[in-house]
Amino acid sequence: MAAAVRMNIQMLLEAADYLERREREAEHGYASMLPYNNKDRDALKRRNKSKKNNSSSRSTHNEMEKNRRAHLRLCLEKLKGLVPLGPESSRHTTLSLLTKAKLHIKKLEDCDRKAVHQIDQLQREQRHLKRQLEKLGIERIRMDSIGSTVSSERSDSDREEIDVDVESTDYLTGDLDWSSSSVSDSDERGSMQSLGSDEGYSSTSIKRIKLQDSHKACLGL
């Protein structure tokens, strides 16, 4: 009972409020809408809010689309500078530009693969040459060691030969002294013999002359 009374009172208050608004609107010269209950009022608020949201989202979408197209134009201009288009680059459409860009990208990828293959080959050759250099270094160290050993052995043999030569020189010097003394003695004996022979030859000649003189004297007699 009390609840029904409160509802009636609320309806009377809303009606009075409506009448007051109509009077004010009539005074200002414009009509007013029919009174709404709470549900209608909430629905109206939601509709207005959705309209505002839709208009806001639409304006946001338009702004984003505008920015996207501006960015796309900028990217196409940069792409024209990267892709070789030829002398008539200003007449190319967006489709032809993208087609040439695709072909150019494929060509660059092929060049990149070839470069990677060549780099791998050069790296393998470098590793091979490095191993060869290490082997040559080890071989050089070994040869230097062998050469130093041979030179040390050769120097030892040279010293031994020098010692042998000195000893043989001393021995030959003694032989030469003995032979020289023998030669001098033989020379003296030879000179004495020659001297004797000369003396014998002289005496024989004298005797022969004397015999000739005596023979001549006899013939003269």
From Swiss-Prot:
Motif (Nuclear localization signal): 21-49
Family annotation (InterPro entries): bHLH_dom, HLH_DNA-bd_sf, MXD1_bHLHzip
GO MF, one annotated term: RNA polymerase II cis-regulatory region sequence-specific DNA binding
Highest taxon, organism lineage: Eukaryota
Chief location of this protein within or outside the cell: nucleus
Matching Gene3D superfamilies: Helix-loop-helix DNA-binding domain
GO cellular component: chromatin; cytosol; Mad-Max complex; mitochondrion; nucleoplasm; nucleus
Residue span(s) of domain bHLH: 56-108
Pfam families according to UniProt: HLH (PF00010)
The UniProt record lists the keyword DNA-binding: yes
Region of interest (Disordered), ranges: 30-68, 173-204
Residue ranges with Polar residues bias: 191-204
Post-translational changes noted in the entry: Ubiquitinated by BIRC2/c-IAP1, leading to its subsequent degradation by the proteasome.
Localization, UniProt: Nucleus
GO BP of this protein: negative regulation of transcription by RNA polymerase II; regulation of transcription by RNA polymerase II
Keywords noted in UniProt: DNA-binding, Nucleus, Repressor, Transcription, Transcription regulation, Ubl conjugation
SMART domains: HLH
Ranges annotated as biased composition (Low complexity): 175-184
Function: Component of a transcriptional repressor complex together with MAX. In complex with MAX binds to the core DNA sequence 5'-CAC[GA]TG-3'. Antagonizes MYC transcriptional activity by competing with MYC for MAX binding. Binds to the TERT promoter and represses telomerase expression, possibly by interfering with MYC binding.
Subunit structure of this chain's protein: Heterodimer with MAX; the interaction is required for DNA-binding. DNA binding requires dimerization with another bHLH protein; does not form homodimers, and does not bind to DNA in the absence of MAX in vitro. Interacts with RNF17.
Full protein name: Max dimerization protein 1
Organism of derivation: Homo sapiens
Lineage: Eukaryota, Metazoa, Chordata, Craniata, Vertebrata
